[in-house]
């Protein structure tokens, strides 16, 4: 009987997870740099899961983030870039992987006008990012990505037309990639430059009522307040009974 109940619980959870990273989300008025999605929820979704994800690094703030994650024994997923600002910190990618965290693709340039000019331009950007990562990690093992601005961003329409994201999502899956957005946004990389307390409030607001949380954070040079907030963010989710995992581990529950 216990096995039957457990199997039923996992079936419900996996259905929710599948909807979270493979569904067409309604666009919101949220700025594209902090694009949110509506999480699928279920009354019987157990266990409660949270994925901490960090975009746009590595940077000087990546190391203290890794130290906090190590101290708290919490895994995370890093959607990395290879911009000029990242160049001196690229060796940290090896440290991220060595610590047991997940490396995933974000963008080589993070310049919307370039990466969304066409589908070919997007995949050239991904190729450049993979090449930048080759000295530090097994790029063949990386099969997750996050679209800059999210999978339903509208800024891409200016450069590649209204249908470009739909095409890119289909192409990503054809190429063997998983892609994922988020449903909890720290807003730590916005122009308002929130302090640590506000970052935590933003997360608590978005996480409320969700049993599966994918949290958007950043590990750029400008997000020192994220480092300050991280211990309290982790404490909050622990107090709420969440289990921490990478996005790949979440998908593996299927």
Model regions and ranges:
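Active-site beta->alpha N-cap acidic-glycine motif
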Residues: 22-142, 252-253
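Short secondary-structure boundary micro-motifs
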Residues: 2-3, 99, 175
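Catalytic domains of cell-wall/extracellular-matrix polysaccharide-remodeling enzymes
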Residues: 110-216, 220-238, 242-243, 249-253
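Terminal accessory/targeting
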Residues: 1-51, 67-76, 135, 183, ...
């Amino acid at each position: 009987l216990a096995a039957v109940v457990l199997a039923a619980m996992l079936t419900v959870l996996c259905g929710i997870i599948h909807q979270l990273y493979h569904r067409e989300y309604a666009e919101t008025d949220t700025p594209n740099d902090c694009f949110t999605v509506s999480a699928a929820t279920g009354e019987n979704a157990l266990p409660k899961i949270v994925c901490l994800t960090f975009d746009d690094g590595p940077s000087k703030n990546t190391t203290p983030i890794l130290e906090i994650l190590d101290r708290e024994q919490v895994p995370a997923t890093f959607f990395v870039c290879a911009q000029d600002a990242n160049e001196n910190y690229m060796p940290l990618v090896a440290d991220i992987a060595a610590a047991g965290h997940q490396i995933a693709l974000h963008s080589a340039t993070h310049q919307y006008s370039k990466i969304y000019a066409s589908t070919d331009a997007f995949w050239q950007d991904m190729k450049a990012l993979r090449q930048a990562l080759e000295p530090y990690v097994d790029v063949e093992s990386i099969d997750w990505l996050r679209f800059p601005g999210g999978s339903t961003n509208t800024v891409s329409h200016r450069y590649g037309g209204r249908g470009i994201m739909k095409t890119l999502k289909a192409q990503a899956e054809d190429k063997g990639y998983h892609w994922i957005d988020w449903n909890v946004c720290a807003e730590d990389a916005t122009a308002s430059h929130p302090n640590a307390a506000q970052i935590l409030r933003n997360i608590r607001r978005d996480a409320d009522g969700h049993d599966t949380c994918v949290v958007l954070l950043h590990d750029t040079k400008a997000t020192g307040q994220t480092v300050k907030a991280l211990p309290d963010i982790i404490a909050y989710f622990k107090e709420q009974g969440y289990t921490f995992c990478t996005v790949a581990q979440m998908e593996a529950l299927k």
